[in-house]
Amino acid sequence: MKFELLFGVLLVTLFSYSSAEMLDDFDQADEDELLSLIEKEEARAKECTPRFYDCSHDRHSCCRSELFKDVCTCFYPEGGDNEVCTCQQPKHLKYMEKAAGKAKKFGGKIKKWFG
């Protein structure tokens, strides 16, 4: 009985040690993968297209506003056959940014009042 108990404790100890090493290996692999993704994103980043400028060359190049990224919107001007694309902020996002700004400002006042 003592031998079985000792063998069981040894087996559990070895199993926990090996699983801890495997988790460390997985954590290291996740960190390496995350760093490589960040490096790729930085290398991929280029100049963004400002609001109301032509974005037909790259429809995903619009700049970010305070909270949201602008959207490349395409349309046909009146009496024209050529499609025109510009970076614009959708109205619902514009209103959400205004509301967030007012909420932040109001939150600062409440914090100031109640210390």
Curated annotation (Swiss-Prot):
Residues 21-44 form a propeptide. Keywords: Disulfide bond, Knottin, Secreted, Signal, Toxin. InterPro entries: Spider_toxin_CSTX_knottin, Spider_toxin_CSTX_Knottin_CS. Residues 1-20 form the signal peptide. GO terms for cellular component: extracellular region. It is found in: Secreted. Disulfide bonds join 48-63, 55-72, 62-87, 74-85. Expressed by the venom gland. Belongs to the neurotoxin 19 (CSTX) family. 01 subfamily. Pfam families: Toxin_35 (PF10530). The keyword Cytoplasm does not apply. The keyword DNA-binding does not apply. Its main location: secreted. One of its GO terms (molecular function) is toxin activity. The presence of a 'disulfide through disulfide knot' structurally defines this protein as a knottin. Transmembrane segments: none annotated. This is U3-lycotoxin-Ls1k.
